């Protein structure tokens, strides 16, 4: 996808970096999405940076993430790979932050790049742009709101020791 670069007065490809953070508790990599596209970060001259992972309390953002990359698969959207869904989700999030619909900001690519033909770029780009537009509209118009998870478990009786497949377990019933 290309967008108009006001500073240079020309169309330029949107470069999307897959960004993740390392969870300090479990050491796992988790995808991260910047919801402030004007800020500097990965892809703007920095190899890496330390930041505070925070929850962004905006239901529009939650709806885009939940319906997009964090809550579905690229196959469900008829996309070609996981990267395409990540890109569509990121474009939708940036569009929410900037207040402009993806189809009003972006055009399909007009130049070959990285060995890909214009036809290939346009074919895949159209799919990504359509999904980004759908996610954007869902973010704005969806009715779901984020609620904190809540579990109400009441212990029933006392715990027991049980041998299951030659292993000793402590078991407890809950209701």
Region spans (language model):
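Short, surface-exposed polybasic-aromatic patches that bind anionic ligands, especially phosphate groups
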Residues: 1-173
């Amino acid at each position: 996808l290309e967008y108009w670069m006001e500073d240079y007065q020309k169309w330029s490809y949107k470069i999307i970096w897959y960004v993740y953070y390392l969870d300090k508790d479990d050491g796992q990599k988790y995808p991260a999405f910047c919801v402030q596209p004007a800020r500097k970060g990965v892809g703007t001259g920095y190899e890496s940076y330390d930041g505070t992972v925070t929850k962004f309390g905006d239901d529009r953002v939650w709806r885009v993430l939940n319906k997009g990359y964090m809550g579905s698969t690229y196959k469900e959207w008829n996309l070609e790979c996981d990267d395409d869904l990540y890109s569509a989700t990121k474009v939708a999030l940036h569009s929410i932050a900037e207040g402009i619909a993806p189809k009003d900001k972006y055009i399909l690519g007009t130049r070959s790049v990285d060995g890909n033909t214009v036809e290939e770029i346009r074919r895949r780009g159209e799919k990504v742009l359509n999904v980004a537009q759908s996610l954007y509209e869902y973010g704005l118009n969806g009715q779901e709101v984020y609620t904190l998870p809540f579990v109400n478990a009441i212990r029933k009786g006392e715990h027991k020791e049980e041998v299951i497949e030659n292993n000793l377990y402590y078991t407890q019933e809950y209701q």
